[in-house]
C-alpha cells in the first residue's frame, strides 16, 4: 500500500494513474478509527474499481467545537495495519497544513445551501459546510470515478449527491448500508466513548426507529403531516424518558430530505440524539 501525506505527491500519483486508460479509481473519504462499517465501504470499492484510495483526515472545519475535534479518536497506526490487511492501494493521510495551508478558518468554503441548515444542520453549526469543503478538495485532488459513503450519515450522503450534481463533478456516488452491533446500535467511531450505562441505552434509538416505521406502515399515514407529527411527538417523549436529548426526529423524503407528500415513494426516518455528551445518529428507510 502506498502511503501519501502531501497533496502535491498525490497529484503526481493520480496524474500517472490517469494515463493508464484502464484505471478506475474509487475514493472512500474517512476520518480514521476504522471499523466494520468502513470495511463494507472497502468491499464495494474493491468490487467497483481497480484502484482504491482511502483518505484519513480529521477535518476541524466540520466540528462544532474544538473539544469534539480534540477528543475524536486518532488511531492512524492501527488504521494503516487494517488497510494493508484489506489490500487498499493508496492511503492519503494529509497533515492539517497540507489541506489548509492558510488555516481552515481562512479557507474558501463550500456551502450546499439546501442541506447545510436543515435537520442536523440546525444544531451543528457549520458542520455540513465543513464536510462539503473537504469533500470538494478531495474530489479536486483525486478526481475519482466513484466515491463511496455510508448511509448512517444520511443527510451527508444526500448533500454530497447534490454537491456532485451542482458542481458538475463526473463522479458516481455509491452508498453502503448501515452496519450494526448485535443489539442494533449503528457502528460509529464515537461509540467507544459511551459509558457502560450509556452503551446499554444506546440501542433504544434503533428500537424506536423500528417501532416508528411499523406504526407508519400500519396506519398508512405517509402524507398526512398532522398525523405523523403526532406520532413523532409520542416517540420523542419516549426517547427523552430513556435519557436521550433528542436533536432530530423527523420523517422525510428519502430522495431529497424534503417533507414527504403524496408523490413520495420512499421515506427515511432520521434520528440524532445525545446520551450524556455523545451524539448518536441513525436512520431507517421505508417504502411508501
Curated annotation (Swiss-Prot):
Signal peptide: none
Catalytic center residues: 38
Location in the cell: Cytoplasm
Enzymatic reactions: (R)-pantoate + beta-alanine + ATP = (R)-pantothenate + AMP + diphosphate + H(+)
Enzyme Commission no: 6.3.2.1
Keyword Ligase (UniProt): yes
BP terms from Gene Ontology: pantothenate biosynthetic process
Known partners and oligomeric status: Homodimer.
Task of the protein: Catalyzes the condensation of pantoate with beta-alanine in an ATP-dependent reaction via a pantoyl-adenylate intermediate.
Protein known as: Pantothenate synthetase
Organism annotation: Wigglesworthia glossinidia brevipalpis
Gene symbol of the encoding locus: panC
Amino acid at each position: 500500500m502506498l502511503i501519501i501525506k502531501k497533496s502535491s505527491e498525490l497529484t503526481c500519483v493520480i496524474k500517472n494513474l490517469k494515463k493508464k486508460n484502464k484505471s478506475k479509481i474509487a475514493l472512500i473519504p474517512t476520518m480514521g478509527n476504522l471499523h466494520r462499517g468502513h470495511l463494507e465501504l472497502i468491499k464495494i470499492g474493491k468490487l467497483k474499481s481497480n484502484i482504491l484510495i482511502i483518505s484519513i483526515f480529521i477535518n476541524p472545519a466540520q466540528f462544532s467545537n474544538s473539544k469534539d475535534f480534540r477528543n475524536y479518536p486518532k488511531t492512524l497506526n492501527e488504521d494503516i495495519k487494517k488497510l494493508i490487511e484489506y489490500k487498499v492501494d493508496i492511503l492519503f493521510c494529509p497533515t492539517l497544513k497540507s489541506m489548509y495551508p492558510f488555516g481552515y478558518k481562512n479557507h474558501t468554503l463550500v456551502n450546499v445551501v439546501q442541506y447545510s441548515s436543515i435537520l442536523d444542520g440546525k444544531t451543528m453549526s457549520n458542520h455540513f459546510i465543513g464536510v462539503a469543503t473537504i469533500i470538494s478538495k478531495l474530489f479536486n485532488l483525486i478526481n475519482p470515478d466513484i466515491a463511496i459513503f455510508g448511509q448512517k450519515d444520511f443527510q451527508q450522503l444526500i448533500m454530497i449527491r447534490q454537491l456532485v450534481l451542482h458542481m458538475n463533478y463526473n463522479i458516481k456516488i455509491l452508498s453502503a448500508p448501515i452496519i450494526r452491533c448485535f443489539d442494533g446500535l449503528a457502528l460509529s467511531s464515537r461509540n467507544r466513548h459511551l459509558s457502560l450505562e450509556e452503551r446499554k441505552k444506546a440501542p433504544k434509538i434503533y428500537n424506536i426507529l423500528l417501532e416508528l416505521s411499523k406504526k407508519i406502515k400500519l396506519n398508512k399515514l405517509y402524507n398526512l403531516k398532522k398525523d405523523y407529527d403526532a406520532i413523532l411527538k409520542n416517540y420523542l417523549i419516549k426517547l427523552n424518558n430513556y435519557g436521550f436529548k433528542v436533536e432530530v426526529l423527523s420523517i422525510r423524503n428519502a430522495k431529497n430530505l424534503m417533507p414527504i407528500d403524496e408523490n413520495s415513494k420512499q421515506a427515511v426516518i432520521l434520528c440524532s440524539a445525545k446520551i450524556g455528551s455523545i451524539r448518536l445518529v441513525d436512520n431507517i428507510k421505508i417504502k411508501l
